A protein has these predicted regions:
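Short C-terminal tail/terminal secondary-structure segment
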Residues: 11-14, 63, 148, 153-167
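Substrate-binding pocket helix/loop in short-chain dehydrogenase/reductase
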Residues: 15-17, 21-26, 121
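Active-site helix of classical SDR
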Residues: 40, 74, 82
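Alpha-helical segment proximal to the catalytic Tyr-Lys
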Residues: 45, 87-91
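Residue(s) in the substrate-gating loop at a strand-loop-helix junction
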Residues: 58
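Short, small/polar-rich loop/turn modules that mediate ligand/substrate recognition or access, typified
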Residues: 90, 95, 151-153
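C-terminal helical subdomain
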Residues: 98, 120-148, 152, 159-161
Length: 167
């Protein structure tokens, strides 16, 4: 195994913190961070001679989001996991980095947003729209290609549509 990409997410917006149920909280953590732990743990013995682990975070993990509290918490955990594993796996020659994009148009969007909000998705960023997946893909290629990123580990690349600060 040369490269592991962790790219999974569940989100369910709430209008008020008290709407966030313990079961939703647990499900979000199960999908968005616990799965990363288990996948990485299974992959590390197969990343012999180095390799790369690329975790998918989110701008919401860097700045929070009042309607995506659980999602934001898990993506913040992804960032911390990336930093910690970059240190822990350095002696094995494994680079660990994170791509933390802003809004990206994926099947998750119409599946989780109310229909009247789907058309507005991503309009808040300076580019005025969500990214397309192929606009984010080069971030993963960069971290996967040893000849491009051999000196990078513990980094978070945030393609966020023209924003200059994560807050």
């Amino acid at each position: 195994l040369d490269v592991l990409v962790n790219n999974v997410a569940f989100q369910s917006p709430v209008d008020d913190f008290m709407e966030l149920t313990p079961s939703q909280w647990r499900r979000t953590f199960d999908v968005n961070i616990d799965s990363f732990f288990h996948t990485i743990r299974a992959a590390v013995p197969h990343l012999t001679g180095g390799g790369a682990i690329i975790n998918t975070g989110s701008i919401n993990g860097l700045r929070g989001n009042k309607q995506l509290i659980d999602y934001s918490a898990t993506k913040g955990a992804v960032t911390a996991l990336t930093y910690s594993l970059a240190q822990s796996l350095l002696e094995r020659g494994i680079r660990v980095n994170c791509v933390a994009p802003g809004p990206v148009w994926t099947p998750l969007i119409p599946a989780t947003l109310p229909a009247d909000q789907v058309g507005e998705f991503g309009r808040q960023v300076p580019y005025g729209r969500a990214a397309q997946p192929d606009e984010i893909a080069p971030s993963y290629v960069f971290f996967a290609a040893e000849q491009l990123s051999s000196y990078y580990s513990g980094e978070v690349l945030a393609p966020i549509g023209g924003e200059t600060l994560p807050g």
